[in-house]
Amino acid sequence: KTKKIDGVELTGWFTEDFTLSELNQLKARERIPPLRPNNVQYNDQFSIPTLEQIIELAEKNYKKTGKMVGLYIETKHPTYFQQQNLSLEDPLLKTLAKYSYTRDIAPIYLQSFEVTNLKYFKDQLTLHKTLKRAKIIQLYDEKSMRPADFVAQNVNITYADMATAQGLKNVATYANGVGPWKPYIFNDTYTAPSDFIKNAHAVNLKVHPYTFRPENNFLAPNLKCNGLAENATQRCETGANKEFEMYFKAGVDGIFTDDPALGRKAVDAYLKANSTTM
């Protein structure tokens, strides 16, 4: 079948076509194997967990070790799922409120590239106060694009508009932080950061840019280990660490990375060298 999701026509099978028991039969695979060929060795080894299973795993680990692991949850295509009568927001909040771990203990971040559902989260969290540590994060896509809900509502506001000082001030009325695409902070020359972080911090928004990856293909030209096209998939930890450090120095409050082990090392090294916290 063919469906239009956020303005893009897609042909295939969709999650709403299956039951949970059917989805449980699927195995996870590397999303972009041409760019991360080493990861295909893990294909078909792991089932796709439900949110409840992830919470229960984190809670079990917390009770055993005392180590707290937060949950950073993105609501994917909320306008589309609302149109399918499969709204995500209330089931998500109900699931999080079900467990003492997510209700009272762990830090929770709720993020979306759309705006309307984040405002709904804000209203519900303010009204019910069931999730004591929940925060709301506005994600930013490419600058010329508009949030899918704005497109559906004929609202002519782009992500670039939302990234101005006034735009960030507006976002701060419903969100606790922002998750910008990396180029909002540095362009490919990596000469100096933009005013994005400064303007976000001025209205008390945390800044968590995405996505940090150590393969050459995802690094700026001056950070690659080898600039030859055939080395696009080469892992380049030195370049990735330089990139981490530049964003840390620019003042980010957190990062999204596909290599959490490398990211953790980079954070620890930066904090040790600068005797500070993030």
PLM features per residue range, with description:
Residues 1-162, 166-167, 173-176, 180-187, ...:
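Metal-dependent phosphodiesterase/phospholipase catalytic core, i.e.
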Residues 81-82, 124, 128-278:
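C-terminal active-site rim and adjoining tail of enzyme catalytic domains
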